Amino acid sequence: MALLSPLRAPAAALLALCLIAVPALAVDTSSASGQMDTFMRMRASSDGRDNFAAWWVTVFAVVPGERPREIFKTDGYNVGRFVKAEDGSAQFLSREVSYYKDPKTGAILKEWLNPFTSEKNTILHIANDPVNSRYPAPKPGEAGRFPIMAAGDDVILHLDIPLAYPNPLQPGEYPVESTGPMYLASEHFVFFSKTKDLEDAKAASVPVTYSWARTGPWLPWMKMGTRPGYLLYSGHGKKYPRFDDLPADVREYTKANFPQYQSSPASYVTPNETSWTYYRKQVPAPGK
């Protein structure tokens, strides 16, 4: 997932530019500074502590003329923290892992029998480091940047993030992994918190649940090339304050294979990693 990455670099830029006025709540979520504070407390913590946004996702293959087919699940998390500057701007330092699972047994997979090609594919799990973003300092009188709304006792943050940029895996270099010259996808988040939790000014972080949906191309390791169709991701998640709060199988697999993902990155670096750039690093193009 890309969490707020399940936020990639282009998505983070779109989010930072999103300027939407919203009704005022008992907590200040209408001004730019109030919304920045609310966003930080919902997404992670305003005091710089690590928080873990876990997710549970079902992945469907959508082929023209066919009923969408559940092909696997993916469970994982993003670990991130905010670093605030004296001028009011902030950086979000994060990285994320997600593991593909058998939809029936829930076991973390090493290989996957592709029902479309009848080939057995070696899985490359998601290990994106970093997944960073920047948020400029709020300006006096500036409208709110984030689409936050009140709904009864709840505060809801809704983000739609369309993505389009040159594919890191170009067809000439990766003929069976690439779906074309452009990477086209979209991510959709809805975060939920309680108004009463946000009204507690001493709470640097508040409980959050969220939903996540995504449309995206075939994954490189599926080796589907330009075959018509795409992937549809349907998931939900919850924020946790500690690594030990995550599901046991995700924790154990992470400790055994990606131990550095138990905490956020130490410093802000670019560019961000995606499943496509990670694949390029792990699997050199044929002939190279």
Predicted features, each with a name:
Residues R67-A201:
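Predominantly extracellular/secreted and cell-surface proteins with exposed
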